[in-house]
Amino acid sequence: MSYKTEKILINTFTAITTLFIIAAIFLSLMFACFGAIYIKSSVRGFSMYPTLNESVESAEQNGDTVFINKYQSINRNDIVVANVEWWPSGAIIKRVVGLPGDEIQILELETQYNLIVNGEVLYSRSKEDDAGNSLNNFIHYQKYLTFLSDLENSECVGVGQNGLPCIKVRENEYFLVGDNWNNSVDSLTHGAVSKNDIIGRVDIIVKLKDNYFFSLIGSMLKIMFN
């Protein structure tokens, strides 16, 4: 081996080693910062299906993994995790559909139930669904009506833009509903959740079916460079 060839090999090895060291330092710093901001949690149940736990077979099984940002502000349509007294078995994970000052209703129509926020239809559930879901929709609607009746004469109840009773979201409270809201215990039957009870916003979802490491790294890099 000539001196020139040997020098090229040494320089190449040094460059590769340096790149590995820089990458290792970068990843270490990234994970350190990440750990200071985020809380990791596994999701159980199907109240956020199909957004979460789409490939999970049992409600008792640990499904998708989420990373909860403790410091970000909360906006409509965010997914958040909260500790609430009416769900003692652990934290709940739901979507923010109502902000302070919003008016929330479920309206029964001939063929469907509409979840209405400030007069606008946010979600719909058909009455013509398969038997199980249709029954769940009906039961959930009846629970909502019971809850609304229990709140009568409370400051939490008002009149919506359509002239029908609505739930009013108070200051420093958020209205949380599961994406699979006919199979969810949430604000529609237990009321809005205090801002102080919200742990944080879900920024990263790692699906059970995905490669954990590469999915997490990809999500972290996306957050960093967006």
Model segments located where?
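Soluble "head" domains of membrane/secretory-pathway proteins
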Residues: S2-A15, F20-I22, I39-V43, P50-N226
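Aromatic-capped interface at the extracytoplasmic side
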Residues: L27-M48
